[in-house]
Amino acid sequence: MNFETIIGLEVHVELNTNSKIFSPSSAHFGEDPNANTNVIDWSFPGVLPVLNKGVVDAGIKAALALNMDIHKDMHFDRKNYFYPDNPKAYQISQFDEPIGYNGWIEIELEDGSTKKIRIERAHLEEDAGKNTHGTDGYSYVDLNRQGVPLIEIVSEADMRSPEEAYAYLTALKEIIQYTGISDVKMEEGSMRVDANISLRPYGQEKFGTKTELKNLNSFNYVRKGLQHEVERQAKILRSGGQIQQETRRYDESTGETILMRVKEGSADYRYFPEPDLPLYEIDDSWIEEVRAELPVFPKARRAHYVENLGLTAYDAGQLTSTKALSDFFEAAVAAGGDAKQVSNWLQGEVAQFLNAEGKTIEQIALTPENLVEMIALIADGTISSKIAKKVFVHLAKEGGSAKAYVEKAGLVQISDPAVLIPIIHQVFADNEAAVADFKSGKRNADKAFTGFLMKATKGQANPQVAQQLLAQELAKLLD
């Protein structure tokens, strides 16, 4: 019997506000344990939460970006559970009326076609703290993360393969990153994924019993974990067994999923409205104010790059991989740069430099205008492509005008025959053996002189002019 795979994803995205959702403590990542806490985070008796407006702004922005309806009368709920990293013994979340609902995004499939994935809801909530179990026999609680704002984005079970789940996550991350509400760095925990998966015989409408997968620390692990779960569940069903509703974790060392616990239902959390927070009204003017801040999203940018700027689909995809890179490219084109040349530099020397330095485009000193200026210096023969690489490194590290640096550093390309011919004659005088080889007809002997000339001019000889003059002067040696 063959089975259809049914997948839905729950994605927690950490919002990059300066302070936490209900307290004034810093939400910054990477501080010393418990440095970013106060009495609200520690749940001291009598303290009351105060909602951070910036979190609601981010929630509205996410909902709009994901084509969602917005609950204009918004409230919060208590999700009750006990764990050491949760000192209140409940989490403030949203249950029956999330900030966003009934949304969708479009994903691109391997064959180039597209598919719409529905999004059931997006709700705001606070993160929990972090437990660390030491080798000394003690467990330690760090509440820096307690109260950091999250938005949980819950898809419908519309994905039919691990590959579709991977494509959905890629598209979702791209959209969220473009809104600016999160850096969506999985390695820092600002994007976390739980997957729900079940199988059913083809033709059956009713979903099978699902399992939830956790410990999915990368999109690749999501794909691998889901693939293993497809195989595990299919094997059980084909042998006449039944799937248990449970939570499993993915073990990257074995490539298998391992049982964690029997899955709880929402009734186990005893949700009820949060009594310490009021009902919040999100009016149309607030929504439109946030809508005005939305950027042009990657799909539209890629279409523009291909249809109007003449780039390939591949180049367009690379340039829109981050909003910062796409913005840089567009600014360079607006400054007069040729789209293809700018694209080549960004995907070539610039990308190599960023990878080597471990930086992003906005973290270096290079500006779009300076890159365009440097490309123009190549085009008009002021510098060679080889010298341009040196100029670029300087601009990336120090910034400033490309033209000013080229002139100050003496990097202007030598194209004047009156300057180059005497240097060529000196090269002949300094390399008598090579001259003798050339005169005797030794194969490829003439090619050595190109290297000699470039060395003598410290790479500043115009390659095309140099080749022409070398051929001319070498011919005279045979007269």
UniProtKB/Swiss-Prot annotation:
Gene name of the record: gatB
Presence of the UniProt keyword Chloroplast in the record: no
SUPFAM superfamilies: GatB/YqeY motif, Glutamine synthetase/guanido kinase
Protein name, entry field: Aspartyl/glutamyl-tRNA(Asn/Gln) amidotransferase subunit B
Reactions catalysed, as given in the entry: L-glutamyl-tRNA(Gln) + L-glutamine + ATP + H2O = L-glutaminyl-tRNA(Gln) + L-glutamate + ADP + phosphate + H(+); L-aspartyl-tRNA(Asn) + L-glutamine + ATP + H2O = L-asparaginyl-tRNA(Asn) + L-glutamate + ADP + phosphate + 2 H(+)
Superkingdom of origin organism: Bacteria
UniProt keyword list: ATP-binding, Ligase, Nucleotide-binding, Protein biosynthesis
Family note: Belongs to the GatB/GatE family. GatB subfamily.
